Design a protein with these regions (language model features):
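Alpha4 helix (beta4-alpha4-beta5 surface) of REC/receiver domains from two-component response regulators
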Residues: 67, 80, 90-105, 115-118
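A Lys-centered signature of the CheY-like receiver
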Residues: 109
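Hydrophobic/aromatic residues positioned on beta-strands within the core alpha/beta folds
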Residues: 84-86
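Short amphipathic alpha-helix used as the core "switch/output" element in two-component signaling
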Residues: 42, 66-79
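Helix N-cap/capping motif at the beta->alpha junctions
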Residues: 33-42, 65
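Two-component/phosphorelay signaling modules centered on CheY-like receiver
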Residues: 10-32
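Receiver (REC) domain active-site loop signature in two-component systems and cognate sites
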Residues: 60
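Active-site beta3 strand of CheY-like receiver
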Residues: 48-55
Length: 121
């Protein structure tokens, strides 16, 4: 399973990689990382359908996670990757916007990696 993690903070991307390797320990997962919504779209164009899950922060400079979700749903209407939105706070407005656009799930920081692993099974 090819997973794209999108977050503007390098520390968060590094933490995701370390936690996945340590706590999930599953060889079927491969990871790619993008520092922005724009970089994520570029990766999606080159990788095509190999990315099956996007874990995207909602609040990023430039293109937000909400805008990324919107564009992913437009570019991949028939077989879109799953998109889990990540936020440091569970504000209702962002959740409603993301739900309306087709977000598959929400994760609140700090991430519970055991729970995430269950969702990925």
């Amino acid at each position: 399973m090819n997973i794209l993690v999108v977050d503007d903070e390098m520390d968060i991307r590094t933490l995701f990689e370390q936690k996945f390797r340590k706590e999930i320990k599953d060889k079927v997962f491969t990871f790619q990382f993008a520092h922005s919504g724009e970089a994520a779209l570029e990766l999606l164009q080159t990788e095509g359908s190999s990315i099956v899950l996007i874990l995207s922060d909602i609040n990023m400079p430039g293109m937000s996670g909400i805008e990324l979700l919107k564009r992913v749903r437009i570019v991949h209407p028939s077989a879109p990757p799953k998109v889990f939105m990540i936020t440091a706070y569970g504000d209702k407005e962002n959740r409603e916007s993301a739900s309306t656009l087709g977000a598959d799930d929400f994760l609140t920081k700090p991430i519970d990696f055991a729970s995430l692993k269950e969702k990925l099974q």
